[in-house]
Regions:
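Intrinsic disorder in cytosolic terminal tails and internal cytosolic loops
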Residues: 1-4, 186-200, 453-462
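12-transmembrane solute porter fold
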Residues: 5-21, 26-30, 37, 41, ...
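Helix-breaking motifs and short loop linkers at transmembrane-helix boundaries and internal kinks
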Residues: 38, 70, 91-97, 125, ...
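Conserved MFS/SLC helix-loop-helix module at the cytosolic interface between two early adjacent transmembrane helices
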Residues: 57-93
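Cytoplasmic helix-loop-helix junction between adjacent transmembrane helices
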Residues: 105-137
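Small-residue (Gly/Pro/Ala) motifs that create kinks and tight helix-helix packing interfaces
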Residues: 142-154, 158, 219, 415-423
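Hydrophobic transmembrane-helix bundles of small-molecule transporters
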Residues: 157-279
Length: 462
């Protein structure tokens, strides 16, 4: 690999790690944000919802935009947007403005994730597989150590530091990318100059994006408002109904759209692939329920500092990183289903362990649940990808990958919703135990699904 290629890979890697890093660092900051802005957990959870909803929408749109405006231009623009958001978020006068800057940050980091892999595929031809695997390490590594980094810097410098820490990464990535990422081909980007707004809106399925956003946000607002107030009011019902109607209209629109935001017709055509995405959504629901729930439990219920919370969460990240390469060798020999079955069992074990904890249990014992979920996450990250490729025809693998990412975001959004509904305004030991019981039931259903996959052969190629 040439020196220029190495610098290109470094610039892309530093850019794309910002999305998983910022999505994971925030898990340790939630109790601090509750205290600073004097809000309950249900309201503060929008710091999670907003980021993932924005990412779910921005990444596919920016992927399409890069074909028209150029990948280098989108990547550099994403760095500028991320820089502005990271600089302004600590200056937020209230929580509403913090949510706005969090959404802007999500859009900026999503721009880089959407085009980063494509830049490497196009411009690095020598040892391309090695380069792509290195980028995967940037992504998974950032997500794994995010809570640890977040815990340390919040403990030392307060919550604004989790935004300011992005600036050195952004500046370095921008300077290196400006010099080493080749300029976009003018013939590729010239199409955008002659494209009307109407044609552009059709290309990105603006109507579908709007219906999806309005429906999902309205449904979440209706549910969480009812939970927060402790009663179901007329306004809650109206907002919830708007959400249901919006999502229903979204489904109807997507089935007819020429270039749908989420190609729902693909689900009916390829049922094996559909089940993989359903399972992936459940996997992320389980994993992120622990990932976002446990730091708040440790800090609010057990009074553990941010620093020590980050240290404990590191056991989850390290186990995940160690398990991934082992899973790769195992799956090459035995296929994905044994690894997925083992992952479901580990998630069940970790969930049961949460239920057995009491208020006198040593805090270090939480590491057992974290280790179980960490190993299962390492197995899932490889096995689910392998299962997707086996269940998806080669001619739609690009579409399948897009749906796969959407399933991850939906699972994460559902995890935050589950935590908010179970915990309500404040975290409690009883609520965390109930959460563990619910996760145990969901994990058992995952084990059953994987056992069925083994029996019916749904993980074999379509």
């Amino acid at each position: 690999m040439s020196i220029r290629s190495r610098w290109l890979m470094i610039s892309v890697g530093l850019g794309i790690l910002l999305n998983p890093l910022n999505s994971s660092m925030i898990s340790v900051a939630i109790p601090r944000l509750q205290n600073v802005f004097h809000l309950d957990f249900t309201v503060v959870s929008w710091i999670i919802f907003s980021f993932y909803i924005a990412s779910a929408i921005a990444q596919p749109i920016m992927g399409k935009a890069s074909d028209l405006f150029g990948r280098r231009r989108i990547f550099l623009s994403g760095l500028v947007v991320s820089f502005v958001a990271s600089l302004l978020a600590p200056l937020s006068p209230n929580f509403g403005w913090l949510i706005v800057f969090r959404i802007v940050q999500s859009v900026g980091t999503s721009m880089m994730v959407a085009v980063g892999m494509a830049i490497v595929r196009i411009h690095i031809t020598e040892k391309q597989a090695t380069a792509l695997s290195m980028l995967s390490i940037f992504l998974s590594g950032a997500a794994a150590i995010g809570p640890f980094i977040g815990g340390v810097i919040i403990h030392l410098w307060g919550w604004p530091a989790i935004f300011l820490v992005n600036i050195p990464f952004v500046v370095t990535s921008f300077l290196v990318a400006w010099k080493h990422i080749p300029k976009d081909d003018p013939s590729t980007t010239s199409v955008s100059r002659n494209m009307s707004f109407r044609k552009w809106f059709e290309l990105i399925d603006a109507s579908g994006v709007l219906l999806f956003t309005v429906g999902l946000v309205a449904l979440l607002v209706g549910l969480l408002s009812a939970k927060s107030s402790g009663q179901i009011s007329f306004n809650n019902v109206i907002v919830g109904l708007i959400g249901f109607v919006g999502l229903g209209a979204f489904v109807r629109h997507e089935l007819k759209a020429k270039a749908p935001f989420i190609p729902l017709r693909t689900f009916a055509k390829y049922p094996a692939m559909t089940w993989i995405n359903v399972e992936f959504m459940i996997v992320n629901l389980l994993f992120y329920s622990l990932f976002f729930g446990l730091p708040s439990y440790l800090q609010i219920v057990r009074h553990v500092s941010e620093f020590h919370t980050g240290m404990l969460m590191l056991s989850l990240g390290l186990c995940s990183l160690i398990a991934s390469p082992i899973a790769g060798s195992w799956i090459d020999k035995s296929g994905p289903w044994p690894a997925l079955l083992m992952s479901g069992m580990l998630m069940t074990l970790g969930s049961v362990w949460i239920v057995t904890l009491d208020q006198t249990s040593p805090v270090i014992s939480v590491c057992l649940a974290l280790a179980a979920f960490g190993i299962s996450n390492g197995l899932n990250s490889v096995a689910m990808q392998a299962a997707l490729f086996r269940s998806s025809p080669k001619e739609i693998i690009g579409v399948a990958s897009g749906i796969f990412n959407t399933s991850r975001y939906l699972g994460t959004i559902l995890s935050s919703l589950l935590i908010s509904i179970v915990m309500g305004d404040n975290f409690s030991f009883e609520g965390f135990r109930i959460l563990g019981m619910i996760l145990t039931l969901i994990a058992l259903s995952l084990v059953f699904m994987n056992w069925r996959h083994k029996e019916t052969g749904q993980l074999h190629e379509s």
